[in-house]
């Protein structure tokens, strides 16, 4: 598969066309941002970790009947994916109170919810990815009712699979962000990435943070946390 023109460059990834219009190549970067791009930095080795960790999760989900855009790893920082039309929604699943929901609702960090909470945010950098509900999504024609239900059910299924898998690695899946895309046939598949950039991972024994929060909060040990996740998942 030949890598062609750069199609899109985001905060954490570059997307390239290939000589087969059905596929793209995603390259993961070491650059890191937080707070809507206000904070920037470099996390050495992040691109490699996120690429390999995402591949582990995509393969696990495929094995459990969840369709994804993943095809194969091409290099330490690159993967081949199916071309999809990204739905401009972030689907967030929360098992514990942390981050924005703690600030928004005055919840103490670390409180476990009786059942997972699913939230939607409209993907728009200029607006700061505002939270939206089903009525907003329908009014803006971002997805229809059937698709909203499918996104919700897929997100909860993914949460169930990943949470159980990670507990076996002594990792708590606190919360995470998903993005989905439509195939040419109209099917919805999981896209983007699942990594320490998009998830909150806590050590199940110590509650130590093993994710991007270490960068956001200037906690230090950022590279070590990313590598620890990769190590526990057998990526290094």
UniProtKB/Swiss-Prot annotation:
Catalyzed reaction equations: 5-amino-1-(5-phospho-D-ribosyl)imidazole-4-carboxylate + L-aspartate + ATP = (2S)-2-[5-amino-1-(5-phospho-beta-D-ribosyl)imidazole-4-carboxamido]succinate + ADP + phosphate + 2 H(+)
Pathway membership, UniProt: Purine metabolism; IMP biosynthesis via de novo pathway; 5-amino-1-(5-phospho-D-ribosyl)imidazole-4-carboxamide from 5-amino-1-(5-phospho-D-ribosyl)imidazole-4-carboxylate: step 1/2
For this protein, the Enzyme Commission number is 6.3.2.6
Q: Which residues form a coiled coil?
A: none
Give GO MF terms, alphabetically: ATP binding; phosphoribosylaminoimidazolesuccinocarboxamide synthase activity
User: What Pfam family does this protein match (any one)?
Assistant: SAICAR_synt
Q: Its Gene Ontology biological processes? A: 'de novo' IMP biosynthetic process; cobalamin biosynthetic process
Name the InterPro entries on file: SAICAR_synt/ADE2_N, SAICAR_synt_PurC, SAICAR_synth, SAICAR_synthetase, SAICAR_synthetase_CS
UniProt keyword ATP-binding present:
yes
**Keywords (A to Z) from UniProt:** ATP-binding, Ligase, Nucleotide-binding, Purine biosynthesis
What PROSITE patterns does the record tag this protein with?
A: SAICAR_SYNTHETASE_1, SAICAR_SYNTHETASE_2
What does the sequence similarity comment in the record state about its family? Answer: Belongs to the SAICAR synthetase family.
Report what the protein is called.
Phosphoribosylaminoimidazole-succinocarboxamide synthase
Question: Species name for this entry?
Answer: Coprothermobacter proteolyticus (strain ATCC 35245 / DSM 5265 / OCM 4 / BT)
């Amino acid at each position: 598969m030949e890598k062609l023109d750069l199609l899109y460059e985001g905060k954490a990834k570059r997307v390239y066309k290939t000589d087969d219009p059905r596929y793209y190549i995603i390259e993961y970067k070491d650059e890191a941002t937080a707070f809507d791009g206000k904070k920037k930095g470099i996390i050495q080795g992040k691109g490699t970790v996120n690429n390999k960790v995402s591949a582990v999760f995509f393969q696990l989900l495929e094995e459990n009947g969840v369709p994804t855009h993943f095809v194969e790893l091409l290099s330490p920082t690159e993967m081949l994916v199916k071309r999809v039309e990204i739905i401009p929604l972030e689907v967030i699943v929360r098992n514990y109170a942390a981050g924005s929901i703690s600030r928004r609702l005055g919840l103490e960090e670390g409180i476990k919810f009786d059942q997972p909470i699913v939230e939607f945010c409209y993907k728009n950098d200029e607006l700061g990815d505002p939270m939206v509900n089903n009525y907003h999504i329908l009014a803006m024609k971002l997805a229809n009712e059937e698709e909203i239900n499918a996104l919700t059910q897929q997100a909860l299924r993914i949460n169930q699979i990943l949470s159980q898998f990670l507990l076996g690695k002594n990792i708590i899946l606190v919360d995470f962000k998903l993005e989905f895309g439509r195939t040419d046939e109209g099917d919805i598949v999981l896209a983007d990435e699942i990594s320490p950039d998009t998830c909150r991972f806590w050590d199940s024994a110590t509650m130590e943070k093993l994710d991007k929060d270490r960068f956001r909060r200037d906690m230090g040990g950022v590279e070590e946390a990313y590598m620890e996740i990769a190590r526990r998942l057998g990526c290094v």
